[in-house]
Amino acid sequence: MRVIVKGGVWRNTEDEILKAAISKYGKNQWARISSLLVRKTPKQCKARWYEWLDPSIKKVEWSKTEDEKLLHLAKLMPTQWRTIAPIVGRTATQCLERYQKLLDDAEARDNEELGLGAGEDESSKPATDARGLRPGEIDTDPETRPARPDPIDMDDDEKEMLSEARARLANTQGKKAKRKARERQLEEARRLAFLQKKRELKAAGINLRAKPKKKGMDYNADIPFEKQPAPGFYDVTEEQAKVHAAPVGSTLRALEGKRKQELDEIEERKKRQKKGDGKSNQTQQFVAAREAQIKKLKEQEQIIRRRKLNLPIPQVGERELEDIVKIGQAGELARELVGDGNKATEGLLGEYEALGQAKMARTPRTAPQQDNVMAEARNLRNMMAAQTPLLGEENTPLHGPSVGTGFEGATPRHDVAATPNPLATSARGGVLTSTRTVPGVGTTPLRTPFRDDLNINDDASVYGETPMNDRRRLAESRRALKAGFAALPKPENNFELAETEEDEEEAEEAEPLTEEDAAERDARLKAAREEEERRELERRSTVIKKGLPRPVNVNTYKLLDDLNSAIVEQTDEEMAAAFKLVNLEVAMLMKHDSIAHPLPGTSTPGGLASEYDMPEDDFVAEAKNAIHTELANALGLPGASDEHLRLAIGAAAEENEAAFAEAWAEEREGLVYSPSTRTWVDKTSLSPEELSACYAAMINASRDRVIAEATKAAKAEKKLGKQLGGYQTLNEKAKKAIVDVMEEIHQTKRDMETFLMLKGIEEAAAPARLEKIREEVAVLKKRERDLQARYAELNDRRRENLAAIEQLEEDKIVLAAQVALEAQEGEVADGDVDMNGA
């Protein structure tokens, strides 16, 4: 007995049978499909379809992008090839084989670098391809290999398998479909036989008994919902009288016509004939079209493999180019003037040709790109060869954290290689670097040393060698350093622990503490940030908190002089010194607010750090408590809360408001505004001329204020007119509609009153009018009866006269007949007399 071991290399015939079987049975009945293939199991058939024959499988060469994605996903999800395959767009077997090949290439590259690859031979290379199998080896995964060509002489088993598959696959209908088709053919034959019998009997003069008419409509004889067409303009009697000749002498097959199956066979025969006639021409055209298509696909593949061109953004705009041209023209003019003069002055001006170096300028070469595929393959190979981490050895050496695809996401990291910018590259062989520490601010590129023929500046100069520029650069560095220190967070807790030997021994013996949960750590850090933000908001001044008006620009020295000049002469020097300290603190706080919270229109440069030393929160709290206690004692409310103090101060202010207003009015009457000093002065201290000038200035100021207010009001009115114009139009329309509705209501009321009045008049006059009409109707009825009687009498007389006329006509006819008869008898008698006489 011959034993057949299923499996092995797939052949072309088996692939074709498998594809035909899948097209018939689908991709779920693998047991039925495998019954057509003698040497294959259902599992092998399924693997063959999903690993090789499926049209969606990519069999082209792997690209660099796919290799990077494969290695990156293998690093994130090791050995999960079923998950990686749909992301890469390949099958799991293809991904695994490509992964092993990349690792083998990385190993070979490392061996070449270490000088270990000289003694290798062909037998030591891995067999990654089915065609590279050594003698005696068996391919463990033949479902992923190309099919082997069919042999010229097939075995009997293969021929039997092929014939059986051809027979089974040709039968596209099942048993039930066959039975239904056979029943339809029998029904059609029965119907045709009955029709032929009926026609033959009718031709012989024998009519079959008609079936009893069913109730309802016979849809075979009648037309449901039939509507006769309307008669037209033309005579159609000839068409209706046309007699159709009976099909005498015609066979039933000719009357029935050709069936659909016969028509399909004729059409298929024509197609085969046409295909056979133009087979040679089509073959030549197909070969040419196929070559053109292959060429087009190769061109597209080359285009896809090209690196994307990334050009740098333009460093010089149109306006700057025009300025550069003007500067170059100015230099040329200066050179011509010097050249026309004395030879002694020619050495004072260097040769600064605008396009001198631009003629030989070349775009710097793009930096070499790292091979991410090889780097990732080496890293993965090193990780696979590493020992278990429980041994405590060093970590696996990787090829740099910046090289590779990274761990940022599911897709590999790509470094875009842009064309270098020649303007950002130093002409002396180095790349421009900035010495500033403020982020986002760069130094001016080396402009003067590019064309320094007189060697005024050295190679490393940026701003020049003037002392002013050096001091400016030093001050800027200090300011940036201070800003960096100011941005550092303040320490929350300061602890100093002196650990003894006993503590060290206990720490070694104690168990390690558990690691803090990430969610708890994030919540703690968030609470700390919110607390720090709240403290920063509380450190703001009251003016900033309440949004009170404040000056845009603050001159600390002038403000301090004005505040100190307002201090009343104090007998106590300590109080005067205290007032000065308070004024100094106020001036510094106002300057800090203008820098930290600038207003629109300020002249303070942005990014400037305030020099105000913010007091500690504890000191501020103690000062507020002291002020609160002193204010409560002054108001006679010791121990009162802030709310009670606020109410007490408000009540005291309301009591003194009237007195203050009266005192201010009296004081205001004795003051005038002096335009010369721009202050309010006493009237008694001015001469009449100065007083009139002050009044004139006040009148002009009032007039200007009135004009400004009028202008503002006009602008507001215009703005409101634009905003409310639509609403005004709608209001006018609504008002007009309301007026129209009211007029309609009034008109309706008038009509109703008129009709009510008419109703009353009609109700009063209707009875008399009805009585009169009834009398007229009675008269008309009586007259009609009389006329009807007269008509009946005359009608009877007419009938009598007609009867008399008919009787007279009959008598007349009878009389005429008698006369004619007598005349005829007389003629006969005369004839007899004549004959007797003769």
From Swiss-Prot:
Location of the HTH myb-type domain: 2-57, 58-107
Location of the DNA-binding region in this protein: 30-53, 81-103
Gene3D superfamilies, alphabetized: Homeodomain-like
Pfam family, one: Myb_DNA-bind_6
Listed Basic and acidic residues bias regions: 131-151, 255-278, 520-539
Composition skew (Acidic residues), residue ranges: 498-519
GO cellular component: cytosol; nucleolar peripheral inclusion body; post-mRNA release spliceosomal complex; Prp19 complex; spliceosomal complex
Biological-process GO terms, alphabetical: mRNA cis splicing, via spliceosome; mRNA splicing, via spliceosome
Subcellular location: Cytoplasm; Nucleus
Oligomeric and partner information: Associated with the spliceosome.
Protein task: Involved in pre-mRNA splicing and cell cycle control.
Protein name as catalogued: Pre-mRNA-splicing factor CEF1
Organism per entry: Cryptococcus neoformans var. neoformans serotype D (strain JEC21 / ATCC MYA-565) (Filobasidiella neoformans)
Name of encoding gene: CEF1
